[in-house]
């Protein structure tokens, strides 16, 4: 999770690389889901609620921001239901899944994995599918969480 639902950190070295939500990732995987899909569904549920809040007066006015590890889930939500969000702002979010595959070491990327996705698309493809004036990407990161080149 993120915030209060974030997994518990412990002193093991693997947490540094796989992140505090690795257990949640494996639980979702064993249930036949990606952890990213769980996050995407939560974002879409919140977006739908906000769009219908106050008798629908917010419809089409919900702005979505994905900062850090929340970026890929926000990007997928915006790509899946582009009419739900007025705009998407990604900040310090993973630039490309293909970089994770090539990187010998990465940090906290396990929760972003979607089995077989790279056979079909990468994250920049989702950004390109959105209207240019609707999506803003600021300071994209590499698999280690450093500024992407």
Predicted features and spans:
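Extracytoplasmic/secretory ectodomains and luminal regions
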Residues: 37, 124-125
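Conserved strand-to-loop "acid loop" that flanks and positions the catalytic carboxylate
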Residues: 137-143
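Cap/lid segment of the alpha/beta-hydrolase catalytic domain
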Residues: 1-53, 58-60, 97-108
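Primarily recognizes the serine-hydrolase "nucleophile elbow" in alpha/beta-hydrolase
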Residues: 46-120, 126-129
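Short, charged/polar "capping" segments at the starts of alpha-helices
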Residues: 97-98, 143-148
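Short, proline-enriched alpha-helix->beta-strand connector loops that line the catalytic pocket
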Residues: 130-135
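Glycine-centered flexibility sites
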Residues: 1-5, 66-71, 139
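Alpha-helical structural motif
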Residues: 23, 122-123
């Amino acid at each position: 999770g993120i915030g209060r639902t974030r997994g518990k950190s412990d002193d093991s070295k693997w947490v540094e690389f796989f992140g505090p939500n690795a257990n949640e990732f494996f639980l979702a995987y064993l249930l036949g889901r990606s952890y990213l899909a769980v996050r995407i569904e939560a974002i879409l549920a919140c977006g739908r609620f906000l769009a219908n809040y106050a008798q629908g007066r917010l419809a089409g006015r919900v702005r979505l921001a994905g900062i850090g590890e929340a970026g890929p889930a926000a990007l997928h939500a915006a790509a899946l239901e582009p009419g739900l969000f007025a705009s998407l702002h990604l900040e310090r979010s993973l630039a490309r899944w293909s970089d994770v595959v090539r990187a010998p070491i990465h940090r906290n990327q396990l929760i972003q994995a979607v089995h077989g996705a790279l056979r079909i698309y990468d994250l920049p493809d989702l950004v390109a599918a959105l209207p240019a004036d609707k999506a803003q990407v600021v300071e994209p990161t590499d698999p280690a969480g450093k500024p992407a080149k």
